[in-house]
Amino acid sequence: MSARHPVIAVTGSSGAGTTTTSLAFRKIFAQLNLRAAEVEGDSFHRYTRPEMDMAIRKARDSGKHISYFGPEANDFGLLEQTFIEYGKSGKGQSRKYLHTYDEAVPWNQVPGTFTPWQPLPEPTDVLFYEGLHGGVVTPQHDVARHVDLLVGVVPIVNLEWIQKLTRDMSERGHSREAVMDSVVRSMEDYINFLTPQFSRTHINFQRVPTVDTSNRSEERRVGK
């Protein structure tokens, strides 16, 4: 942790509401005239979308599984090193994972690819992370140890899955079958790597659904 170069992380699952929480932080930064360097959790994925599809097929053929919640599909070491480097020097690198055509076209790329790594802006007052693994701990890596303020957006599973289904189908062009396969395939990693983070957070938020979420596989509008 660093007093000169603090790290703030908002962590939660896909569809949990981390984007809404992050928007609130950005408004706070603006009101306090703080300049934040931002890194996205998706930028630490190991694979492009075609590479991930191939990795999923290989894992399935060998009776194993791989998901974006687990270490096989993410570079926890690089994430940890990013937090360490920023805490020491206020420097680091970032890139983006391009989910949609709208995101990809300005880069002259296709969805499911990464932008090149680029230096973080300087100088900045804080590093802000939003993603799946801001508080992850494994036998090899302790990302949570390097975060000064760790905020969790904890699971409300049915609401979370409905929002993920709606977003991935309407905004990212995935089929219902592909989204539900992703949810089912991710369960072991979800339990082992995502949910333990919420015992390490400094603050947790938990949303309360105000719509019918009884059928978690039903696409419906539930807000952001």
Please state what every model-predicted region is.
Residues 136-141:
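Conserved ATPase-coupling elements of RecA-like P-loop NTPase cores
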Residues 1-5:
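Phosphate-binding P-loop
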Residues 14:
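The conserved Walker
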Residues 8-11:
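Short hydrophobic/aromatic beta-strand immediately N-terminal to the Walker A/P-loop
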Residues 18:
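Conserved lysine of the Walker
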Residues 113-122, 126-129, 143-145, 157-224:
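C-terminal accessory "lid"/substrate-recognition subdomains
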Residues 34-40, 44-105:
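Conserved nucleotide-sensing/catalytic segment adjacent to the nucleotide-binding pocket
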Residues 21-22, 26:
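Post-Walker A alpha-helix
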